[in-house]
């Protein structure tokens, strides 16, 4: 039996009901008012739910059944790389030596953990073609900002603090211009050409003596490889700027091509995406930043180094460093999972990851091409972007298609992004899905396309089988109710 109207845990609370019992107090009782300032002592008890253990288990188990994750179903969320997270990663992350280590304990007692971090840095240096890596940033956008702050420090150290422009393509992730703004730069947008790639001629028009950097994802958010990357890098370098690599799409080129060999000066990675840290629930993530030699002095400190004696040490003596960007040394647990993944796969395995990710995306694209518009009809990399323009003419929007997918148990693709594709549907299958899964999803997408032609109302009014139908998203955004208030 399924309770369609799931109550809040506060609403099943009954005064005096408890889930656990404690032993009788065997030490002198202390009055909080005697040991805490008066302003820190509550005048009345906090309104916390009073429930039994059984109530708790049933409540959260019921909620868990409403969640969708990669362990429960296909998750083709474009530009998010929702691949399966191997459970060996979880087992290793739970080793007592990793799970119980504390960032403030003496370095001499944490050499094993530090060795893992150092080896992970070394692996990421090899994968990216950079010269040094910091594991400090907590996630992707944090890595972007960290890299931009290093670029800013580099220019200022060279007496070129006037460089205040960061160039981003019109297909860029929204975090790129946001990170540039937070780092104190002005964003300049460069257009895409008819092939979905950066328009070189438009790029020539916007570069100049005030150019600090070009931010680029390769392949880009259309799933297309920027074929002119060498020319673009040379152009930016010719005016004294730096070229930054957004690692969101590294899954498409891993062990096939390296950002450092393409002319990039720095790169951020998403270990929670490409290297199988669980994600989708708001964190934790890991966004390491790799740099070429001339940016090494500006890395966040402390920098993890290995001494001549083979010991591992956090080096704080970095006078040009941009300083800490996160307490302690990054999200250690995610780094352990990424290290486990890299060691499990090896170079050949990582190469196969890329090959299957690209194969799966191209297979799906060709199966769906007859039923949806394909703005850029060419081989893609790890993801591709369809357009619901054809369906829009029939009164069915991309949003409707996404909602209809829920009826079949699928998480929808990314919708309405990139912004330069009308009614966009961005699909990324990843390498971990079978042909059977891809076919089943494509069959549903084809069915929805036919429904848009023959019975559009069933798509327009979807979803029909979920616990809740369409929410008033505008009202939710403008007047959010973020905490429980007793009636």
UniProtKB/Swiss-Prot annotation:
Name of the protein in its database record: Probable glycine dehydrogenase (decarboxylating) subunit 2
E.C. designation(s): 1.4.4.2
Taxonomy of the source species: Bacteria, Bacillati, Bacillota, Bacilli, Bacillales
Family (UniProt): Belongs to the GcvP family. C-terminal subunit subfamily.
Gene behind this protein: gcvPB
Domain of life according to the entry: Bacteria
GO molecular function: glycine binding; glycine dehydrogenase (decarboxylating) activity; pyridoxal phosphate binding
Keywords tagged on the record: Oxidoreductase, Pyridoxal phosphate
InterPro entries noted in UniProt: GcvPB (IPR023012), GDC-P_C (IPR049316), GDC-P_N (IPR049315), GDC_P (IPR020581), PyrdxlP-dep_Trfase (IPR015424), PyrdxlP-dep_Trfase_major (IPR015421), PyrdxlP-dep_Trfase_small (IPR015422)
Cofactor list: pyridoxal 5'-phosphate
GO cellular component, one term: glycine cleavage complex
GO biological process terms, semicolon-separated: glycine decarboxylation via glycine cleavage system
Pfam families: GcvP2_C (PF21478), GDC-P (PF02347)
Biological role stated in the UniProt entry: The glycine cleavage system catalyzes the degradation of glycine. The P protein binds the alpha-amino group of glycine through its pyridoxal phosphate cofactor; CO(2) is released and the remaining methylamine moiety is then transferred to the lipoamide cofactor of the H protein.
Catalytic activity annotation: N(6)-[(R)-lipoyl]-L-lysyl-[glycine-cleavage complex H protein] + glycine + H(+) = N(6)-[(R)-S(8)-aminomethyldihydrolipoyl]-L-lysyl-[glycine-cleavage complex H protein] + CO2
Main EC class the enzyme belongs to: oxidoreductase
Record organism: Lysinibacillus sphaericus (strain C3-41)
């Amino acid at each position: 039996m399924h309770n369609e109207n799931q109550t809040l845990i506060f609403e099943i609370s009954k005064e005096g009901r408890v889930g656990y019992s404690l032993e009788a107090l065997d030490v002198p009782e202390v009055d909080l008012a005697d040991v805490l300032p008066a302003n820190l002592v509550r005048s009345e008890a906090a309104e916390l739910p009073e429930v039994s253990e059984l109530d708790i288990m049933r409540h959260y188990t019921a909620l868990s059944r409403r969640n969708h994750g990669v362990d429960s179903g296909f998750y083709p969320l474009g530009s998010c790389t929702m691949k399966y997270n191997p459970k060996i990663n979880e087992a290793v992350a739970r080793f007592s030596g990793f799970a119980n280590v504390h960032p403030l304990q003496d370095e001499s007692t944490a050499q094993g953990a530090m060795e893992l971090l150092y080896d992970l840095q070394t692996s990421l240096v090899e994968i990216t073609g950079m010269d040094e890596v910091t594991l400090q940033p907590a996630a992707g956008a944090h890595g972007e900002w960290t890299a931009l702050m290093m670029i800013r420090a580099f220019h200022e150290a060279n007496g070129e603090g006037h460089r205040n422009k960061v160039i981003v393509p019109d297909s860029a992730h929204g975090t790129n211009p946001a990170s540039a703004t937070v780092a104190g730069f002005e964003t300049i947008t460069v257009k895409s050409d008819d092939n979905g790639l950066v328009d070189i001629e438009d790029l020539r028009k916007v570069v100049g003596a005030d150019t600090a950097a070009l931010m680029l994802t390769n392949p880009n958010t259309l799933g297309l490889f920027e074929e002119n990357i060498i020319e673009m890098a040379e152009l930016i370098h010719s005016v004294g700027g730096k070229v930054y690599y957004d690692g969101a799409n590294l899954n498409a080129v891993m062990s096939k091509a390296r950002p450092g060999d393409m002319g990039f000066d720095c790169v951020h990675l998403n270990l929670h995406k490409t290297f199988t840290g669980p994600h989708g629930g708001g964190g934790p993530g890991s966004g390491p930043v790799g740099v070429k030699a001339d940016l090494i002095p500006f890395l966040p400190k402390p920098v993890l180094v290995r001494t001549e004696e083979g010991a591992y040490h956090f080096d704080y003596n970095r006078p040009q460093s941009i300083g800490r960007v996160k307490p302690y040394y990054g999200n250690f647990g995610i780094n352990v999972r990424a290290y486990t993944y890299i060691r499990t796969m090896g170079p050949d395995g990582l190469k196969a990851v890329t090959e299957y990710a690209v194969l799966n995306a191209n297979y799906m694209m060709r199966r769906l091409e007859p039923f949806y518009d394909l703005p850029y009809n060419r081989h893609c990399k790890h993801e591709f972007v369809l357009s619901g323009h054809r369906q829009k003419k029939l009164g069915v929007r991309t949003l409707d298609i996404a909602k209809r997918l829920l009826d079949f148990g699928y998480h929808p693709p990314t919708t309405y992004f990139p912004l330069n594709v009308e009614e966009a549907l961005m699909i990324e299958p990843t390498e971990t899905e079978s042909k059977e899964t891809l076919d089943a999803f494509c069959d549903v997408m084809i069915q929805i396309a036919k429904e848009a032609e023959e019975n559009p109302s069933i798509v327009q009014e979807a979803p029909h089988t979920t616990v809740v139908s369409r929410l008033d998203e505008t009202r939710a955004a403008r007047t959010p109710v973020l905490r429980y208030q007793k009636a």
